[in-house]
């Protein structure tokens, strides 16, 4: 089965992230434009600030837009999918055209269980709903910026995720098929990991928000401070670590047999590991009391 357009998109973006990392830190470390396009938030605060490059920046709080878009798109797809499953009403033709484009040049559906596909979409729905809530009511964003490249990439992920997942199914004859014994084990393990990672990520974001709030919940500062407690005792970036676990859980549910889900999972893995390494290095340089045994993203490993 050929690599689909949807999967190819995320493979290319994964390679682009790796390429940019080496360009910024090894090949052209003094080219400000590359650094401004690649680095985000506190990682770029001490660099030069040519006003012309502000054109490529957006507020970091715009991360909220990712999850708002994800809620709208994913909820819409779940509603349309429910109509297909319950009432046998096919997806609207424009939506089918999007699916066909993302799955091209393939025409034969993947052999992934329909039940597993639905579970992945439900997991993504829970993820974007929770993250949207956290961005609006938990997180306290600094006044730092991200590049428009990161912003567009984030929008693209949450715009295409659900469609990429559904594109490889037989969406005209979608069925909630059963799963075999191994499939059931994968569903149970994947769902357990998903809820565990989601809970730990929520705890992590509360720890980060408390660094900028008083005991009464009033925002006191927007500084970057050294977090402690929870998974921060083991890694510098537990929010990135748990994000990796969440998309790993989705791939476990589909038994690593869904091309697009795997491609997106690899993109998340590579992107979060690179961002974690840079953030870890920033903490070590800026805090003398930084714990020596704390890793970047994977406890006890990296």
Which residues make up each language-model segment?
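Hydrophobic alpha-helical transmembrane segments of polytopic
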Residues: 10, 63-73, 120-127, 150, ...
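Juxtamembrane loop-transmembrane helix junctions in multi-pass integral membrane proteins
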Residues: 51-54, 58, 108-118, 141, ...
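Membrane-embedded alpha-helices of multi-pass membrane proteins, especially ion channels
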Residues: 15-30, 72-89, 124-139, 157-171, ...
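Transmembrane helix-loop junctions in multipass membrane proteins, especially transporters and channels
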Residues: 86, 139-143, 170-174, 209-213, ...
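Hydrophobic transmembrane alpha-helices
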Residues: 1-26, 157, 176-302
